């Protein structure tokens, strides 16, 4: 098998922990977007009011974040990130009661995959809904994810750096006063291509559903 030099995108993605730790709390967005970035996904979803949001002024279902590295099943990790250690790696947070993130990544042959799941616990349903709407307003394209939490949104982007494609999916879910964000991306460093939009989108949504289930099955206030 011929030897291929890996582009800068791989180096940046294999060791993201230091960068995220310095930030304290950040939603990963994959390799830096370039002017060649393309937005792709289902049609844009209309702004939705979370159907299950409480009308109480300061309603709050969750008081702490669940253990993020235990929120995704080993079977799902093996499927989405072949070759990764199923235990994952938790990224340091300034307040683990309110914000926690776990990541998994692996290079198997020339196929690279990255997955992370983040939980943020806000002071109320209303605060979570506001943050959710602000986050999706910053995105372009995308569509709703029905049947998960109170509101859900998914978007898939394609970026190209050093002629290497990377496709990344981001799923954001609001569940009561909690926000769950999943980032899933991949690249093929032999073909220089990226996995299909369908593969990345379905993988991110699969992980998001498991993360929300772990949140909801945990301790409530």
Predicted regions and their residues:
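A small/polar (G/S/T-enriched), proline-flanked helix-loop surface module common
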Residues: 3-17, 24-221
């Amino acid at each position: 098998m011929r030897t291929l030099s890996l582009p800068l995108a791989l180096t940046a993605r294999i060791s993201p922990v230091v960068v995220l730790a310095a930030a304290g709390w950040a939603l990963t967005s994959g390799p830096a977007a370039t002017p060649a970035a393309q937005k792709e996904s289902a049609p844009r979803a209309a702004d939705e009011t979370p159907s299950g949001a409480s009308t109480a002024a300061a309603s709050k279902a969750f008081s702490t974040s669940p253990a993020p590295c235990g929120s995704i099943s080993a079977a799902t990790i093996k499927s989405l990130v072949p070759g990764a250690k199923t235990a994952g790696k938790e990224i340091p947070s300034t307040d683990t009661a309110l914000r926690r993130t776990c990541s998994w990544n692996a290079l198997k042959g020339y196929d690279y995959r990255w997955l992370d799941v983040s939980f943020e616990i806000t002071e109320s349903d209303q605060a979570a809904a506001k943050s959710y709407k602000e986050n999706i307003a910053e995105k372009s394209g995308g569509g709703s994810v029905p049947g998960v939490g109170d509101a859900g949104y998914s978007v898939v982007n394609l970026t190209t750096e050093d002629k290497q494609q990377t496709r990344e999916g981001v799923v954001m879910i609001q569940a009561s006063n909690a926000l769950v964000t999943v980032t899933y991306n991949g690249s093929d460093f032999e073909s220089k291509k990226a996995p299909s939009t369908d593969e990345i989108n379905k993988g991110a949504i699969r992980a998001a559903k498991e993360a929300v289930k772990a949140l909801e099955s945990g301790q409530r206030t």
